[in-house]
Amino acid sequence: TPEYGQRNPYLQEVRFSVELNLNLPAYAPLQQVGNPVLITTTGVGTQGVYVINTGFDQFRAFEAACPNHAPNTCSLLKLSGQNVVCGCEGYTYTLFTGQMLERPNDGKRYYDLLSYQAELFANTLRVYQP
């Protein structure tokens, strides 16, 4: 796994900031623990951002592109419960921590999901990359 703070070489640094009103129907699932939502607003992340409520008013936000190769037509992660799966190699990641599940033991370096900042203010969730 990469050292803390080291960014992924396959995914570019995309600066963005988006505010999600949790009262709106599109984001209401985020009011419940364990319900992920995909944000596909243009300019938010490389291929979008998955956001999940992890409990106790804490949220996690992750890039929707697979972190283990350059973005392409199959690299958009597909939602599977509280996990996401790469359409290219089938790599699976948990949205609670961003960690890759069943990491191959072949000596190659594998990356966990690229994380973004998420802060809750009243009923508005700000997701951003400074």
Regions found by a protein language model. Name each.
Residues 2-81, 94-95, 99, 112-130:
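N-terminal pre-ligand scaffold of iron-sulfur
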Residues 66, 86-88:
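Short cysteine clusters
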Residues 106-109:
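Short Gly/Pro-enriched turn/cap motifs at secondary-structure boundaries
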